[in-house]
Amino acid sequence: MPTLTSYFGFLLVALTITLVLFISLSKIRLI
């Protein structure tokens, strides 16, 4: 199932990027 693995990997990367952006915005708001 290469397609399922690729989809899961893409979802994981998207979630990581979203989490990093959210943390960055939170830090900017704190400052």
UniProtKB/Swiss-Prot annotation:
Entry GO MF terms: electron transporter, transferring electrons within cytochrome b6/f complex of photosystem II activity
Superkingdom to which the source organism belongs: Eukaryota
Gene Ontology CC annotations of this record: chloroplast thylakoid membrane; cytochrome b6f complex
Topology in the lipid bilayer: Single-pass membrane protein
Residues in coiled coil: none
Pfam families on file: PetL
Subcellular compartments: Plastid, Chloroplast thylakoid membrane
Membrane-spanning intervals of the chain: 3-23
InterPro entries: Cyt_b6/f_cplx_su6 (IPR007802)
GO biological process terms on file: photosynthesis
Keywords: Chloroplast, Electron transport, Membrane, Photosynthesis, Plastid, Thylakoid, Transmembrane, Transmembrane helix, Transport
Family the UniProt entry places it in: Belongs to the PetL family.
UniProt subunit comment: The 4 large subunits of the cytochrome b6-f complex are cytochrome b6, subunit IV (17 kDa polypeptide, PetD), cytochrome f and the Rieske protein, while the 4 small subunits are PetG, PetL, PetM and PetN. The complex functions as a dimer.
PANTHER family in alphabetical order: CYTOCHROME B6-F COMPLEX SUBUNIT 6
Purpose: Component of the cytochrome b6-f complex, which mediates electron transfer between photosystem II (PSII) and photosystem I (PSI), cyclic electron flow around PSI, and state transitions. PetL is important for photoautotrophic growth as well as for electron transfer efficiency and stability of the cytochrome b6-f complex.
Protein name: Cytochrome b6-f complex subunit 6
UniProt organism field: Populus trichocarpa (Western balsam poplar)
Gene that this sequence comes from: petL
